Amino acid sequence: MIKTSVIRFLKSPIKAGVLLVFWVCVSYFLFTTKIYWNEVNRPIDLMMEILPYIFLVYLVIAYECFYDIKRFHMEELLLGNGQLLRAQGKEFVVLLGADLLGSVYLFAFHIMCYSQADVFCKALVLYTVRVIFIYIFLMILVAICIGWAISLVTSRLYGLALIALTFYVFDMSFLSLLSSMSDKHEFLWKLTTLFSFFFQSRRGICRDADYLLTAENVHIYRALFFVFFMLAIILWKQAGRKAWSAVSGMLAVTFLALFFQPTGAVYFMMNIPNTRDSVSYVERYRQAEYSDISLTKKGQNKKGFRVESYDMNVTVTDQFRAEACVVPSDGTQKEYPFTLQYIFQVDQVTDERGEKLTFEQDEDYLLVHNSRGKIHSIRIVYHGTTKGFYATTQGMMLPANYAYYPMPGWHRIFLESGDPYPGLKGKLVGDDCFSREVFSEETDFKVTLRCKGKYPVASNLKTLAQTKEHGFVVWKLSGRSDGITLIGNSYLVERNIEGVRVICSRLDRENVPKGENVSKYKELFRKIEQQTKYSMKGKTFIVSPDYNYINWCVANDHIVDTLLGERDIIETLNTGMLYPAEDDTEVKLGTDNWIESLE
């Protein structure tokens, strides 16, 4: 009976005692650590700090429970009957109950923090349930299954050694070792994904204050596939019949293959196997060996050509897929240069009649060749996963200065610390960041956005319609601008302040447009209009979450800002943008002399 297993577990001073002491220590850590209530991500950061130790404790307890049962049922193990497996199944249910209690306790801690921070809302509660389920409940379940499998090793010494090895393998230290070796070994990229998926112990794991911790459905699938893989291994090890051994062995191979299936979901601070997304921009600019093929000719400037209009179809699931129809003002050019993030792979380029056009793609640059003499439009189909910013089923942050759609001309879209700002003599980049310039000229945009996530989406463009179609939320956007910013999450709020459309997150207590914060916005808009030639009337002001690589940008109809760089915004507006239109700086591919080319 399961009741007997529960009583035996509670009477065990080692198992129940260690678990009780551990959770008392966890409580002390959580409730004595200073928490800044305006930081919604702080409770999640604390949870991720203790997660490796939660994993280790449950791993050891599971090993002890199943090892004791194996000793008491050694005769059944030798005979190969089902008594041992049934006894282990009861113990598994007891441990699953302990897993559930720990998950509920941490969930209650998060709810208390949200109430104190005055950000309690249904969307945040549902998100927290998902995070606790993935990073606590499922990870403890993984630890239980691994402990069960290790207990099948006959020697206790070998078992303890395997526990120590397992903890090291699933810890960040092993992940760091693999990451340092993965540049030259493709197989290690896959191992990096395997072991980095489960938990990370460093602070600052949250992407930003709106996206928080990545918790897409793919994480649930992969964790469950790994659990099923471990259970199949256990069944294979203890199956008394050859038929059962064969079936369980095939199931184990199948679940492991499913676990390794590639995915487009965002793994913040993790490597993605077999994609160039595994290397950050900083690493690429400093270390990557660039292609020997140069797509530019000496003397050609970065501007390229003018675009009459964009007609885009964008689909956002765990991966970003898009089709951009670009109408150039001059359809007789032999070549059309575009800037497009290196993480997006161009699948096809055609003209208005559907006939293929040849193209070259190298790093952030795309060159389309026109062999037909005259074309009306260029249709570019591409896909990929966003780096630095994001667009998944959980949230979206794609500012206008981020080349997630093909922009005319070649531009340097990422700046490193110490680089000179083009157009601003003597001014250097402080931190690595994406360029703040919107590279397109004002043109007509028509966007159809199909989003798998059910969160609201906002943009500087006008929303014409919002419908539901085959499990997707479809947004119809249209307008005239020099760039598109798309932002989406479950916490968006919008308010009109003196003719300015302000978009912000309700989780951002310091900037949410209500109460005393309204006067802060009015003062900022007044300063911008008094000290620059930029009129805020009728514009859109998007408050972006603050995180690595985020900065701000200024377009003709909207501003994206964290409200941390007021002085920089005014300076930029007064200098006519960071990259003045008359700047014909040449960008050459296949080289790494970025700083020299910009001086």
PLM regions and their residue ranges:
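Extended, low-hydrophobicity, Ser/Thr/Pro/Gly-biased non-transmembrane segments
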Residues: 382-481
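Secretory targeting signals
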Residues: 30-52, 63-64, 92-159
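Hydrophobic alpha-helical segments
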Residues: 111, 119-235
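N-terminal, polar/Ser/Thr-rich
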Residues: 121-123, 174-224, 241-318
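A surface-exposed beta-strand-loop module
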Residues: 335, 343-400, 467-470, 513
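Hydrophobic alpha-helical transmembrane segments
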Residues: 1-69, 236-246, 250-256
